[in-house]
Amino acid sequence: ATLLSKREIEILVHLAMGKNNAAIANDLNLSVHTISNHRKNMLSSSRCSTTAELVRIATIENLI
């Protein structure tokens, strides 16, 4: 079972494409603050130190 919500995985896919919070917020019609919160929550729940590490682990686990 994944620790990430569907929305978090959706955001993670955008992060893996190299998009920043503002671009993701624009694409998903959300606020930059919301994207930032999701990103922080993903890092916290996954115990990853960086977004790059989070993307790497998600790729290995076939989440994205």
List PLM regions with ranges.
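Regulatory hinge/linker segments at domain boundaries
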Residues: 1-14
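Enrichment for repetitive, rod-forming helical segments
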Residues: 14, 46-47, 63
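Recognition helix of helix-turn-helix DNA-binding domains
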Residues: 20-53
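Intrinsically disordered, low-complexity basic tails/linkers immediately adjacent to helix-turn-helix/homeobox/MYB/SANT
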Residues: 57-64
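Short alpha-helical segment immediately N-terminal to, or the first helix within
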Residues: 12-17, 28, 57
